[in-house]
Structure formats: structure tokens, C-alpha cells
Amino acid sequence: TMVTVWKITEELKGGLFALILSATAVTFSALFRLNTLFQPNSLDVLCWTLLYYTLIKYVNTSNRKWLWALAAVFAIGFLNKYSIAFLVVGLVPAILLTEHRKWFAQKNFYLAAVFTLLLISPNLIWQYQHDFLVFKHMEELRITQLVNVNRLDFMKDQLLYFMGGLFIIVFALFAFVVYPPFKKYRFIPLSTLFTLLLFVYFRAKSYYAIGLYPVLLAFGAVYLDYLLSSNWKVYLKPVAIVIPLLLFIPVLRIAFPIYPPAEIAAQRDLYQKYGMLRWEDGKDHELPQDFADMLGWKELAHKVDRVYSQVKDKKHTLVICDNYGLAGAINYYSKYKEIGAVSFNADYKYWFNLKDDITTVISVKNAHNEDIENKGD
């Protein structure tokens, strides 16, 4: 993502200061917290940023190869995580409101759309064969998690992801209005607005929108490079670069798992203030959910191994878990590589061995909730 932001900054004719500023703002942000999690979000943000990059290149060159590149980027992003579709839905009205609405009358635009459909068709066919499970999943997500999302908290969280680069984003939004070279890119802030409105309406999790901001950091850095390029203002350039570094310090403390669980629990008020203790159930817990989910994986696998070792007929034994996280942890850390833990959650439901009869079942339950009594092993 950082490299893509660098390339966008170059495409916007930003100088060395703009390149360093945009890269610094991306690097020293909560964005890299996503890389600590075994989730598709890192690639998701990269695809969002790359999609904007291909659009910017197409605006500047009108070369149809960038439409094909856009199609490929969207397809990769879609196959990784469906949320990139929200970005495209936000882009459509944004483009229609600018002079680029002419794209919708071009043959190459629709050829690229067909190319996209071909690339994602295996997934669409699979969804069709399984009665479009994505909609069932979204409904389950809405009922169990998104119903607990506070829309005001969603908007407040947007300010925290790039706290050190927030001033850069503000300058970017201002530049789209007053800076003539950016006039042709006004569909970008409009797409940000429309996509955010979509997420607010559907009560999306706040991090879903994080991919909207890297491109804005590039625009803001280029505009600041222009503003600070003469007279005494050039001396403000080092200050602008230092700001993201300084403001990253409190973000590092809160957003990254650099402290042991006991110390995080001891600073409950601080983490609660920034909503870090709020879980998907809408309640505050002792630890941030992403960090809590990582704890005890090895211990869990060892406990299951102790039980599994006592089973004589392992071939006809089923280890079934409450969710894919538990199943994945057991399969990864267990000393029994054939243990094959499964779950009715996510893709694991398709990995059950239905060839052999089951005589023994080991059930692994989720005991995260504080109202569940700890009954030992």
C-alpha cells in the first residue's frame, strides 16, 4: 500500500517532500495493525488503493490498458473480500457527477466490465451453486454483529486510523476545491463521501472504510508540497514530516499489541476511552477482541491433544469447534497433523470427512463470553 501511495504521489507530480510525507503518513498509522491479523484486510486496502491508482492513470492517459488493469485489481480485491464492491458502488455516482461521466458511453469501459465478470465468474458460479451463501452470511453478520455498531462511533473511529496524517487528508479535501490541477480528480472525494454514507447506512464496522484514505494522503502531500515551496514556508516541511511520527506514539500504545494482557487490562480506562474494548457483541471486555482472540491458541491445542491422545480409534474421531478460529488454531498447533478439526463456521463446513463413520466427538466450545463459567479442562 505504501508503494502504491508513493506511485500515486509520483503520478500527481509530487516532489521528494510529497513522496516522503505521504509514505510516512501511511507507514506510521493504524493501517499496519491490519498486518498483525490473519485476515484479508491488508490485501483489501491494497486493492482499494490500487483501484484508485488505475483510475488516476486512466484520467491522465486515456489509455485503455488502465481499464483492464482496473478490472484485474477489482477482481483480485473481490475474490479476496467482497467489501471492495462498496467502493465501486460509491464510485459510480461520483463519476456521474463529474466530467468523467462520458466513460459510461465508451465501449472499452463495458469490455473491461465483461472482463471483470469473467475473472470473478468462478466465485459467482460457486455462490449460485450454494444458493448465494454470501447473502446468508451478510444477514447473519447483520443480526449478530452489525446491529451492535454505533454509527457515531463509526465516524469517530475514522479520525483515529490516520491520526498523524489527518491534517494531510484535510488539505487534500480542500485542494480538490481550490487547486486547479486536482479538478479532474474530484470524483475521488465524492466516492469517499458516497462510500462512507453506504457504510454508515449499513452499520458497517469502522475498519471497513480504511482503504479510502491512503489515496487522499497522496493528494494532500502533493498539495502541501505546492503550498510550502516558497519563502519561509519551506522550513515547515520538516515539521509536517515529524507530525505523523509524533502522533503515532499514542496510536502505537493503543492500537498495537505491544503490551502484555495484564498491562492492557490494568489500563482499562484508556482503552475503553477509544472504544478498543468494545467487541462484536456490543459489550466492553477486558481486552481488545482481536488481541484476545490470539491468546491461548497453543494452550487450546495442547488441551485438545491430551483428550485426543486418549482416543484409541482416531480414524473415526471428529473434532468439531464453535468457529474457524478455534479449528484453525488446533490444526496449526496440534502435534497430530491428521487431527482435522472442523467447524460449521465459514469454509470449514465443506471440509468434513463424510466417508468414515464417527464414533467419538470432541467438542471445542468458545468460552470468550464473560458469563460462561470456567469449568476447567
Q: Which residues make up each language-model segment?
A:
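Transmembrane-helix signature of polytopic, membrane-embedded enzymes
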Residues: 5-27, 45-46
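Short helix- or helix-capping micro-motifs
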Residues: 21-29, 74, 78, 92
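Hydrophobic/aromatic-rich transmembrane helices and adjacent perimembrane loops
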Residues: 187, 197-232, 236-237
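Transmembrane-lumen/periplasm boundary regions of multi-pass, lipid-linked membrane glycan transferases
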Residues: 76, 85-185, 196-199, 203, ...
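Signature aromatic-anchored transmembrane alpha helix within multi-pass, membrane-resident enzymes
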Residues: 227-268
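Short acidic/glycine- and proline-prone juxtamembrane loop motifs at membrane-interface regions
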Residues: 30, 36-44
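Specific aromatic-rich, kink-prone transmembrane helix
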Residues: 2, 43-60, 66, 72-74, ...
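Membrane-interface transmembrane helices that cradle and orient dolichyl/undecaprenyl
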Residues: 11-16, 51-67, 173-181
